[in-house]
Amino acid sequence: ECCHPACGKHFSC
C-alpha cells in the first residue's frame, strides 16, 4: 500500500 505524502497519505508503512 502507498503510504507516503505523494499518494495523499501520511501513515507509517
Curated annotation (Swiss-Prot):
Keyword Zinc tagged: no
Task: Name the tissues where it is expressed.
Answer: Expressed by the venom duct.
Q: Where, per UniProt, does this protein localize?
A: Secreted
InterPro entries, alphabetized: Conotoxin_a-typ_CS
Concerning its family, UniProt says: Belongs to the conotoxin A superfamily.
Q: What is known of its domains?
A: The cysteine framework is I (CC-C-C). Alpha3/5 pattern.
Gene Ontology CC terms: extracellular region; host cell postsynaptic membrane
User: What is the protein's given name?
Assistant: Alpha-conotoxin GII
Q: Which domain of life is it from?
A: Eukaryota
Task: Please describe what this protein does.
Answer: Alpha-conotoxins act on postsynaptic membranes, they bind to the nicotinic acetylcholine receptors (nAChR) and thus inhibit them.
Q: Which PROSITE patterns match?
A: ALPHA_CONOTOXIN (PS60014)
Residue(s) carrying Cysteine amide: 13
- Keywords in alphabetical order, please: Acetylcholine receptor inhibiting toxin, Amidation, Disulfide bond, Ion channel impairing toxin, Neurotoxin, Postsynaptic neurotoxin, Secreted, Toxin
Give the GO molecular function terms: acetylcholine receptor inhibitor activity; ion channel regulator activity; toxin activity
- UniProt entry tagged with the keyword Disulfide bond: yes
Q: What is the lineage of its organism?
A: Eukaryota, Metazoa, Spiralia, Lophotrochozoa, Mollusca
The disulfide bonds in this chain are: 2-7, 3-13
